[in-house]
């Protein structure tokens, strides 16, 4: 994850990856984790996602981490929330408001406590292959024993399109989360009318995974 790349995306408001509403995958498949209200939730590379609101309605503690300070400030400003802000270092800030705890800074160094549940819709696929193993090592360290992950990935021929978002095929998911129980909940194949297929991709699929420690 090149910091400058994502900082520029937010600074210029080129955020096509941001959804204006709750992701339907979250609402459809979160129950597969058998979540409980008192279980803590971690959302890596959270942006200013509406998914955070949906999760906070169902859990007492939702923690996120986001590289872009612009995104974190926008999350609270757009909801008219006034968070408590703590400067942890020259490059890391902590924003807290009710159920929300969001770190503004580097995912790899933010002091995030292990959570019961993790939701990764757009984090793993945002990273190039050479960064994904380290990312998952850190992610696994932030999951409690008995914890569960809801993971969303994409599968396409990486030679046909430059990411992000990047393709993370099934064999890589299996390798990254080796030793954990991995269940594919959905594979949604794009049809001929899908924008990615119209742009020339030979295949494009979105996959949803339940990963249990």
Curated annotation (Swiss-Prot):
Q: What is its EC number?
A: 2.1.1.67
Q: Does the keyword Transferase apply?
A: yes
A biological-process GO annotation: methylation
Keyword Thylakoid among record annotations: no
Subcellular location(s): the record lists:
Cytoplasm
* Chief localisation class: cytoplasm
Which GO cellular component term is one of those annotated?
cytoplasm
Keywords from UniProt, A to Z, are: Cytoplasm, Methyltransferase, S-adenosyl-L-methionine, Transferase
What does the record give as the reaction this protein catalyses?
S-adenosyl-L-methionine + a thiopurine = S-adenosyl-L-homocysteine + a thiopurine S-methylether
Which enzyme class, named as a word?
Answer: transferase
Cite the binding residues for S-adenosyl-L-methionine.
10, 45, 66, 121
For this UniProt entry, the molecular function terms from Gene Ontology, in alphabetical order, are: thiopurine S-methyltransferase activity
The record's annotation in Pfam families points to: TPMT
Family to which this protein belongs: Belongs to the class I-like SAM-binding methyltransferase superfamily. TPMT family.
Q: NCBIfam families this protein is in?
A: PRK13255.1, TMPT_Se_Te
Q: What is this protein called?
A: Thiopurine S-methyltransferase
Origin organism is Aliivibrio fischeri (strain ATCC 700601 / ES114) (Vibrio fischeri)
